[in-house]
Amino acid sequence: MHKEFQYRTEQIIKIQPNKIAIYTQKANSQTHDAPPPKRYILQQTKNFKTSAHNFELSKSAQKKIKDKISWLYHFAPKRNITSYSKKIVIGFKIGFYTFTLPSKQMHTSKDITSQCFNQLLTELRTRTGMKNYLWKLEYQKNGNVHYHLATDIYLDFFFIKSIWNRIINKLGYVDRYKEKFANMTLTDFIADYDHADLSKDDIILKFNDMKINGAGEPPSVNVQGVRSFNNISAYIAKYFSKSADPNAKRNEYDTPENCGRMRLWFCSLSLSACHGVTMFHDRTTDFINDFIIFDKSIKVFFHDFCTCIYYNVSKISNGFKGIFYKILHDYKIHINYPCTS
């Protein structure tokens, strides 16, 4: 008679900066109570391929991005920053930066990523010590590619704009921007740019100044500092992981054949190592039950295969807060997460 195969199961708890998951797995699966397997950094080869994506983030990728942003925000120290212009930024945690093309895209996004954006990341790692970061590629409404970057390093606006404009001008994007303005009439100037906040006289003055002094450096960078406002990390995570803008259009150079497997997002090795603190649930049953019963700031959802507890570590009661900070701090040390000064 055929003997039915059976195996023993056990309940596992997985703790992340914004949620706790309780689920069942086969017994003897490894948890973070045991040393992790040795991690190898694999060099890219010609045989390496990423999955085809049709220029859309998968649901799995969106979830991963949300989780990585939560880790980035939680591990980032809160500090005051003095910028290059001597401006003091109070309570800085992470920065959110956007890099655009100042003129019409003339190359595939894959080429721009490999020749320009990758060079930007290399220079930022070398010159600023950036180690913990995540980036995402998107299309604008005009079809141009642009990049969002989140990192725990403060990057001065003028500093990164100078670097980015120098790099993208290898492909002529700054020169074409200046040529466009050099040949622009006042009618074109008004039609191409939104000057609703300026009077007609101010528009003419701005246009004449541009004609005399040149267009200057294009505004190809946007900077947003993220401080300790309530749930701001959740906002950034949601923005980073959102689906593509339905009004955006892909430029004429990008096709599924030449760009269908290019990266739409990526994170540093330090964030890639952040998965969650896993332990056996029987060791934490009383603690989790008390957390659910006594802390009113949390939200609990019961799913078919797991239970999820969502929380904001800054809002939970002090007794639980100290425990979670200790667990996550020990995990940071356990995975050798790089510190940011």
Feature-to-residue mapping (PLM):
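Right-hand nucleic-acid polymerase module
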Residues: 1-143, 154-341
